[in-house]
Amino acid sequence: MTKPIILTGDRPTGKLHIGHYVGSLKNRVLLQNEGSYTLFVFLADQQALTDHAKDPQTIVESIGNVALDYLAVGLDPNKSTLFIQSQIPELAELSMYYMNLVSLARLERNPTVKTEIAQKGFGESIPAGFLVYPVAQAADITAFKANLVPVGTDQKPMIEQTREIVRSFNHAYNCQVLVEPEGIYPENDAAGRLPGLDGNAKMSKSLNNGIFLADDMDTVKKKVMSMYTDPNHIKVEEPGQIEGNMVFHYLDVFGRDEDQKEITAMKEHYQKGGLGDVKTKRYLLDILERELSPIRERRLEYAKDMGQVYQMLQKGSEKAQAVAASTLDEVKSAMGLNYFK
Protein backbone atom coordinates (compact mmCIF):
# COMPACT_ATOMS: atom_id res chain seq x y z
CA MET A 1 0.00 0.00 0.00
CA THR A 2 1.33 3.45 -0.96
CA LYS A 3 2.15 5.70 1.98
CA PRO A 4 0.43 9.11 2.20
CA ILE A 5 2.76 11.89 1.07
CA ILE A 6 3.54 14.88 3.29
CA LEU A 7 5.17 18.10 2.10
CA THR A 8 6.26 20.96 4.34
CA GLY A 9 9.02 23.54 4.56
CA ASP A 10 10.31 26.92 5.72
CA ARG A 11 11.53 30.21 4.27
CA PRO A 12 15.30 30.43 4.88
CA THR A 13 15.47 34.04 6.05
CA GLY A 14 17.33 33.33 9.29
CA LYS A 15 17.77 30.70 11.96
CA LEU A 16 14.61 28.94 13.09
CA HIS A 17 13.11 29.74 16.49
CA ILE A 18 11.01 27.90 19.05
CA GLY A 19 7.85 29.18 17.39
CA HIS A 20 8.82 27.16 14.31
CA TYR A 21 9.63 24.23 16.57
CA VAL A 22 6.27 23.94 18.33
CA GLY A 23 4.31 25.18 15.32
CA SER A 24 5.57 22.63 12.82
CA LEU A 25 9.07 21.13 13.28
CA LYS A 26 8.18 18.95 16.27
CA ASN A 27 5.17 17.56 14.46
CA ARG A 28 7.21 16.81 11.34
CA VAL A 29 9.64 14.69 13.32
CA LEU A 30 6.79 12.75 14.91
CA LEU A 31 5.24 12.09 11.50
CA GLN A 32 8.62 11.08 10.07
CA ASN A 33 9.34 8.63 12.86
CA GLU A 34 5.92 6.99 12.64
CA GLY A 35 7.13 5.46 9.40
CA SER A 36 3.64 5.65 7.90
CA TYR A 37 4.35 8.56 5.55
CA THR A 38 6.62 9.67 2.72
CA LEU A 39 7.95 13.04 3.89
CA PHE A 40 9.35 15.88 1.74
CA VAL A 41 10.78 18.90 3.58
CA PHE A 42 12.09 21.88 1.65
CA LEU A 43 13.87 25.18 2.10
CA ALA A 44 11.68 27.71 0.27
CA ASP A 45 14.41 30.04 -0.97
CA GLN A 46 12.46 31.16 -4.05
CA GLN A 47 9.50 32.14 -1.90
CA ALA A 48 11.85 34.01 0.43
CA LEU A 49 13.02 36.08 -2.54
CA THR A 50 9.51 37.53 -2.93
CA ASP A 51 10.35 40.00 -0.17
CA HIS A 52 14.17 39.68 -0.13
CA ALA A 53 14.91 40.09 -3.85
CA LYS A 54 17.52 42.78 -3.22
CA ASP A 55 19.13 40.89 -0.35
CA PRO A 56 19.66 37.34 -1.63
CA GLN A 57 22.77 36.89 0.52
CA THR A 58 20.58 36.65 3.62
CA ILE A 59 18.81 33.68 2.06
CA VAL A 60 22.01 32.05 0.83
CA GLU A 61 23.56 32.28 4.30
CA SER A 62 20.38 30.99 5.93
CA ILE A 63 20.22 27.77 3.92
CA GLY A 64 22.95 26.16 6.01
CA ASN A 65 21.47 27.42 9.27
CA VAL A 66 17.99 26.11 8.52
CA ALA A 67 19.44 22.77 7.39
CA LEU A 68 21.29 22.55 10.72
CA ASP A 69 18.07 23.32 12.57
CA TYR A 70 16.28 20.57 10.64
CA LEU A 71 18.91 17.99 11.50
CA ALA A 72 19.14 19.16 15.11
CA VAL A 73 15.42 18.71 15.81
CA GLY A 74 15.55 15.20 14.40
CA LEU A 75 14.71 15.35 10.71
CA ASP A 76 16.63 12.46 9.18
CA PRO A 77 17.72 12.49 5.50
CA ASN A 78 17.53 8.69 5.54
CA LYS A 79 13.84 8.87 6.42
CA SER A 80 12.79 12.16 4.78
CA THR A 81 13.73 13.99 1.58
CA LEU A 82 15.24 17.39 2.43
CA PHE A 83 15.70 19.70 -0.56
CA ILE A 84 16.13 23.29 -1.77
CA GLN A 85 13.23 24.81 -3.72
CA SER A 86 15.31 26.72 -6.27
CA GLN A 87 17.08 23.54 -7.34
CA ILE A 88 13.79 22.14 -8.70
CA PRO A 89 13.09 24.17 -11.89
CA GLU A 90 9.92 22.15 -12.54
CA LEU A 91 8.22 24.04 -9.70
CA ALA A 92 8.49 27.38 -11.51
CA GLU A 93 7.01 25.89 -14.68
CA LEU A 94 4.08 24.42 -12.77
CA SER A 95 3.50 27.83 -11.17
CA MET A 96 3.20 29.43 -14.60
CA TYR A 97 0.50 26.99 -15.68
CA TYR A 98 -1.43 27.38 -12.43
CA MET A 99 -1.39 31.19 -12.56
CA ASN A 100 -3.70 31.01 -15.55
CA LEU A 101 -6.30 29.30 -13.35
CA VAL A 102 -6.41 31.95 -10.61
CA SER A 103 -7.78 35.49 -10.84
CA LEU A 104 -5.95 38.49 -9.45
CA ALA A 105 -9.01 39.29 -7.33
CA ARG A 106 -8.85 35.84 -5.72
CA LEU A 107 -5.19 36.29 -4.85
CA GLU A 108 -5.90 39.69 -3.31
CA ARG A 109 -8.67 38.20 -1.15
CA ASN A 110 -6.38 35.63 0.47
CA PRO A 111 -6.45 36.69 4.16
CA THR A 112 -2.97 35.36 4.91
CA VAL A 113 -1.48 37.37 2.05
CA LYS A 114 -3.43 40.49 3.06
CA THR A 115 -2.11 40.24 6.61
CA GLU A 116 1.48 39.72 5.48
CA ILE A 117 1.30 42.64 3.03
CA ALA A 118 0.20 44.90 5.89
CA GLN A 119 2.93 43.56 8.19
CA LYS A 120 5.67 44.07 5.61
CA GLY A 121 4.54 47.62 4.80
CA PHE A 122 4.65 47.25 1.02
CA GLY A 123 2.05 49.98 0.52
CA GLU A 124 1.41 50.36 -3.21
CA SER A 125 4.68 48.62 -4.11
CA ILE A 126 3.66 44.99 -3.66
CA PRO A 127 6.05 42.71 -5.59
CA ALA A 128 4.12 40.62 -8.11
CA GLY A 129 6.02 37.57 -6.93
CA PHE A 130 4.76 38.11 -3.39
CA LEU A 131 1.14 38.42 -4.45
CA VAL A 132 1.26 35.17 -6.42
CA TYR A 133 3.30 33.12 -3.94
CA PRO A 134 0.20 31.09 -2.94
CA VAL A 135 0.25 29.79 -6.53
CA ALA A 136 3.90 28.83 -6.14
CA GLN A 137 2.98 27.06 -2.91
CA ALA A 138 0.34 25.13 -4.83
CA ALA A 139 3.07 24.09 -7.27
CA ASP A 140 5.28 22.94 -4.40
CA ILE A 141 2.50 20.86 -2.88
CA THR A 142 1.11 19.34 -6.08
CA ALA A 143 4.51 18.57 -7.64
CA PHE A 144 4.95 15.89 -5.00
CA LYS A 145 1.25 14.93 -4.96
CA ALA A 146 1.17 15.66 -1.25
CA ASN A 147 -1.89 14.36 0.57
CA LEU A 148 -1.05 16.17 3.80
CA VAL A 149 0.60 19.51 4.57
CA PRO A 150 1.54 20.32 8.20
CA VAL A 151 1.19 24.08 8.70
CA GLY A 152 0.28 26.63 11.33
CA THR A 153 -3.37 27.58 11.67
CA ASP A 154 -2.65 30.92 9.95
CA GLN A 155 -1.87 29.00 6.74
CA LYS A 156 -5.35 27.48 6.29
CA PRO A 157 -6.20 29.93 3.46
CA MET A 158 -3.11 28.74 1.57
CA ILE A 159 -4.23 25.13 1.73
CA GLU A 160 -7.70 26.07 0.52
CA GLN A 161 -6.25 28.04 -2.38
CA THR A 162 -4.19 25.02 -3.41
CA ARG A 163 -7.29 22.83 -3.27
CA GLU A 164 -9.10 25.30 -5.53
CA ILE A 165 -6.26 25.20 -8.06
CA VAL A 166 -6.26 21.40 -8.04
CA ARG A 167 -10.00 21.28 -8.68
CA SER A 168 -9.75 23.92 -11.42
CA PHE A 169 -6.92 22.09 -13.19
CA ASN A 170 -8.49 18.65 -13.02
CA HIS A 171 -11.83 20.06 -14.23
CA ALA A 172 -10.34 22.21 -17.01
CA TYR A 173 -8.33 19.35 -18.47
CA ASN A 174 -10.75 16.54 -17.62
CA CYS A 175 -8.21 14.58 -15.62
CA GLN A 176 -7.26 13.49 -12.10
CA VAL A 177 -3.56 14.34 -12.32
CA LEU A 178 -3.37 16.63 -9.29
CA VAL A 179 -4.14 15.62 -5.69
CA GLU A 180 -6.16 17.78 -3.27
CA PRO A 181 -4.14 18.18 -0.07
CA GLU A 182 -5.40 18.36 3.50
CA GLY A 183 -3.81 20.57 6.14
CA ILE A 184 -2.46 19.16 9.41
CA TYR A 185 -2.68 21.73 12.19
CA PRO A 186 -1.12 21.83 15.69
CA GLU A 187 -3.23 20.02 18.29
CA ASN A 188 -2.15 22.53 20.93
CA ASP A 189 -4.00 25.78 20.10
CA ALA A 190 -1.44 27.81 22.06
CA ALA A 191 1.32 26.41 19.84
CA GLY A 192 -0.46 27.31 16.61
CA ARG A 193 1.27 30.68 16.43
CA LEU A 194 3.60 31.30 19.34
CA PRO A 195 3.71 35.01 20.31
CA GLY A 196 7.01 36.80 20.78
CA LEU A 197 8.71 37.12 24.15
CA ASP A 198 7.45 40.71 24.28
CA GLY A 199 3.82 39.70 23.80
CA ASN A 200 3.84 40.74 20.15
CA ALA A 201 1.60 38.53 18.03
CA LYS A 202 4.57 37.44 15.94
CA MET A 203 7.91 35.96 16.96
CA SER A 204 10.58 36.98 14.49
CA LYS A 205 14.25 37.75 14.05
CA SER A 206 13.50 41.29 12.84
CA LEU A 207 11.55 42.09 16.00
CA ASN A 208 14.28 40.55 18.18
CA ASN A 209 11.65 38.82 20.29
CA GLY A 210 12.38 35.15 19.77
CA ILE A 211 14.40 32.27 21.17
CA PHE A 212 16.33 30.53 18.42
CA LEU A 213 17.21 26.86 18.29
CA ALA A 214 20.84 27.91 17.92
CA ASP A 215 20.84 30.12 21.05
CA ASP A 216 23.19 29.02 23.83
CA MET A 217 21.92 28.53 27.37
CA ASP A 218 23.05 31.95 28.61
CA THR A 219 21.24 33.67 25.75
CA VAL A 220 18.07 31.69 26.42
CA LYS A 221 18.27 32.64 30.10
CA LYS A 222 18.64 36.35 29.33
CA LYS A 223 15.69 36.24 26.96
CA VAL A 224 13.44 34.36 29.37
CA MET A 225 14.25 36.73 32.23
CA SER A 226 13.24 39.69 30.03
CA MET A 227 9.88 38.20 28.99
CA TYR A 228 6.66 40.16 29.09
CA THR A 229 4.47 39.22 32.06
CA ASP A 230 1.83 41.30 33.86
CA PRO A 231 2.97 44.96 33.83
CA ASN A 232 0.75 45.68 36.84
CA HIS A 233 2.26 42.89 38.94
CA ILE A 234 4.72 45.18 40.70
CA LYS A 235 4.92 43.47 44.08
CA VAL A 236 5.22 39.73 44.69
CA GLU A 237 2.36 39.69 47.19
CA GLU A 238 -0.06 41.30 44.74
CA PRO A 239 -2.38 39.18 42.54
CA GLY A 240 -1.17 38.81 38.96
CA GLN A 241 -2.87 38.22 35.62
CA ILE A 242 -2.03 35.07 33.68
CA GLU A 243 -3.99 36.08 30.59
CA GLY A 244 -1.60 37.78 28.19
CA ASN A 245 1.32 36.78 30.41
CA MET A 246 3.90 35.25 28.08
CA VAL A 247 5.52 33.10 30.78
CA PHE A 248 2.30 31.21 31.41
CA HIS A 249 1.50 31.09 27.71
CA TYR A 250 4.86 29.42 27.07
CA LEU A 251 4.32 27.04 29.99
CA ASP A 252 1.05 25.97 28.37
CA VAL A 253 2.90 25.30 25.13
CA PHE A 254 6.07 23.61 26.39
CA GLY A 255 4.82 21.91 29.54
CA ARG A 256 4.44 18.15 29.28
CA ASP A 257 1.68 16.06 30.82
CA GLU A 258 3.74 15.49 33.96
CA ASP A 259 4.15 19.27 34.38
CA GLN A 260 0.47 20.17 34.30
CA LYS A 261 -0.21 19.77 38.02
CA GLU A 262 2.66 22.13 38.90
CA ILE A 263 1.69 24.64 36.20
CA THR A 264 -1.92 24.73 37.39
CA ALA A 265 -0.77 25.29 40.98
CA MET A 266 1.54 28.11 39.85
CA LYS A 267 -1.28 29.82 37.97
CA GLU A 268 -3.54 29.71 41.03
CA HIS A 269 -0.74 30.99 43.27
CA TYR A 270 0.13 33.82 40.86
CA GLN A 271 -3.50 34.93 40.60
CA LYS A 272 -3.91 34.96 44.38
CA GLY A 273 -0.63 36.78 44.96
CA GLY A 274 2.61 35.70 46.59
CA LEU A 275 4.38 34.32 43.51
CA GLY A 276 6.98 36.50 41.82
CA ASP A 277 7.81 36.71 38.13
CA VAL A 278 11.42 35.69 38.68
CA LYS A 279 10.36 32.33 40.09
CA THR A 280 7.93 31.64 37.24
CA LYS A 281 10.61 32.55 34.70
CA ARG A 282 13.15 30.23 36.30
CA TYR A 283 10.63 27.41 36.13
CA LEU A 284 9.97 28.17 32.46
CA LEU A 285 13.72 28.23 31.78
CA ASP A 286 14.03 24.69 33.18
CA ILE A 287 11.13 23.54 31.00
CA LEU A 288 12.65 25.13 27.88
CA GLU A 289 16.16 23.84 28.52
CA ARG A 290 14.84 20.31 28.89
CA GLU A 291 13.63 20.65 25.30
CA LEU A 292 16.36 22.80 23.80
CA SER A 293 19.54 21.34 25.33
CA PRO A 294 19.64 18.13 23.23
CA ILE A 295 18.71 20.09 20.10
CA ARG A 296 21.57 22.52 20.74
CA GLU A 297 24.07 19.70 21.25
CA ARG A 298 23.09 17.96 18.01
CA ARG A 299 23.25 21.24 16.10
CA LEU A 300 26.79 21.94 17.26
CA GLU A 301 27.84 18.44 16.21
CA TYR A 302 26.38 18.74 12.69
CA ALA A 303 27.92 22.22 12.28
CA LYS A 304 31.39 20.66 12.43
CA ASP A 305 30.99 19.34 8.87
CA MET A 306 28.96 21.74 6.71
CA GLY A 307 30.22 20.00 3.58
CA GLN A 308 28.30 16.92 4.58
CA VAL A 309 25.21 19.02 5.31
CA TYR A 310 25.23 20.50 1.79
CA GLN A 311 25.91 17.09 0.27
CA MET A 312 22.78 15.84 2.04
CA LEU A 313 20.78 18.75 0.57
CA GLN A 314 22.14 18.05 -2.92
CA LYS A 315 21.13 14.39 -2.80
CA GLY A 316 17.70 15.31 -1.48
CA SER A 317 17.24 17.92 -4.21
CA GLU A 318 18.15 15.42 -6.93
CA LYS A 319 15.64 12.94 -5.54
CA ALA A 320 12.94 15.62 -5.28
CA GLN A 321 13.57 16.85 -8.82
CA ALA A 322 12.92 13.40 -10.25
CA VAL A 323 9.51 13.32 -8.54
CA ALA A 324 8.59 16.85 -9.65
CA ALA A 325 9.66 16.12 -13.23
CA SER A 326 7.32 13.14 -13.35
CA THR A 327 4.38 15.26 -12.19
CA LEU A 328 5.23 18.01 -14.67
CA ASP A 329 5.17 15.46 -17.51
CA GLU A 330 1.68 14.40 -16.44
CA VAL A 331 0.51 18.02 -16.22
CA LYS A 332 1.83 18.88 -19.69
CA SER A 333 0.32 15.73 -21.16
CA ALA A 334 -3.07 16.61 -19.67
CA MET A 335 -2.80 20.09 -21.23
CA GLY A 336 -1.71 18.70 -24.60
CA LEU A 337 1.77 20.23 -24.37
CA ASN A 338 3.62 16.96 -24.95
CA TYR A 339 4.36 17.83 -28.58
CA PHE A 340 7.22 15.44 -29.16
CA LYS A 341 5.83 12.30 -27.54
Swiss-Prot record:
GO cellular component terms, A-Z: cytosol
Stretches assigned to coiled coil: none
Binding site for L-tryptophan: D140
Source domain of life: Bacteria
EC number(s) given by UniProt: 6.1.1.2
Short sequence motif 'KMSKS' region: positions: 202-206
Keyword annotations from UniProtKB, A to Z: Aminoacyl-tRNA synthetase, ATP-binding, Cytoplasm, Ligase, Nucleotide-binding, Protein biosynthesis
GO biological process, one term: tryptophanyl-tRNA aminoacylation
This protein's record includes keyword Ligase: yes
UniProt GO molecular function: ATP binding; tryptophan-tRNA ligase activity
Chief place of localization: cytoplasm
Stated family: Belongs to the class-I aminoacyl-tRNA synthetase family.
UniProt name for this protein: Tryptophan--tRNA ligase
Gene, per the UniProt record: trpS
